Amino acid sequence: MKFKEIFKGNNSAYGIMQLTGETTEKGKAVAKAFIKRETITDKLWQEHIDGKEPALGVIPINEDNQCRWGCIDIDVYNVDHLVLMRSIKGLGFPLVTFRSKSGGAHLFLFSKEDIPASLM
């Protein structure tokens, strides 16, 4: 599974998040998050890709304090994702933009090889 390679991270734990259906005054979707001290299975990956809850949260830093990707979480819930993507492209930043479940944005940076987490 290609997603599994792209989002390679910690093999001994992962996060899960379940939306409650509520929102804050600022418009953020409310969720409950937990850490599971287990290996991520192919079934969990597939369910995440299929959009089933709970959402899967890969921990990017592996057991050797290295990572292949990082993510900036933007907690602005009325952000215009198209404007954000154009701004990032205009600045020449190598970031990939996704809408987060809460309505904000996640900006991902990827590396072809493991690098020290402190550099990411």
Segments (PLM) and residue ranges:
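Active-site-proximal helix/loop segments of hydrolytic enzymes
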Residues: I72
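Anionic group-transfer/hydrolysis microenvironments
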Residues: D75
